[in-house]
């Protein structure tokens, strides 16, 4: 890992947190919003490994919780778990290929499903109606929207064409 990667990751995370708090609510569709921070956590998990993805998920989730005023620890726990799960798909030799393929999208969708489920359960949102209702009314739409927002990452990495890591 070069000495410039960590500052770039930190700067990218800060910019994405700012965008997630200020601009993403503007593009919400019926209160469904994509989770750009989760896309970054999955990207880091697949690029640098499970440990790095887990730690980055925890740090990004904590900073987001502090900046957004959400229940402290709910986003941190959800993103930590999502980074951990996404890290299972890390393979040093195929990392660049996975990030450029539909597999990245599928991993983002899986991580978004886990992230949204854990976040809503921990934060206690709409749980009084039951998990199936929560799944259909919030978790699945947020997951689909997050997956849709991961497509530009795949297109960019394919367009760029050079080695990622």
Residue ranges of each PLM-predicted region?
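Terminal, non-globular segments
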Residues: 1-165
């Amino acid at each position: 890992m070069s000495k410039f990667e960590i500052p770039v990751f930190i700067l990218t995370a800060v910019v994405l947190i700012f965008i997630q708090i200020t601009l993403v609510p503007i593009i919400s569709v019926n209160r469904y919003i994509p989770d750009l921070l989760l896309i970054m956590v999955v990207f880091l998990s697949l690029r640098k490994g499970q440990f790095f993805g887990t730690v980055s998920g925890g740090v990004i989730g904590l900073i987001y919780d502090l900046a957004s005023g959400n229940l402290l620890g709910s986003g941190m726990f959800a993103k930590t778990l999502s980074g951990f799960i996404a890290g299972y798909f890390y393979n040093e030799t195929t990392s660049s290929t996975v990030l450029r393929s539909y597999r990245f999208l599928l991993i983002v969708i899986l991580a978004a499903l886990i992230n949204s489920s854990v976040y809503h359960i921990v934060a206690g949102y709409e749980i009084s109606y039951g998990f199936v209702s929560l799944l259909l009314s919030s978790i699945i739409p947020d997951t689909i929207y997050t997956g849709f927002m991961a497509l530009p990452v795949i297109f960019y990495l394919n367009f760029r064409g050079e080695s990622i890591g």
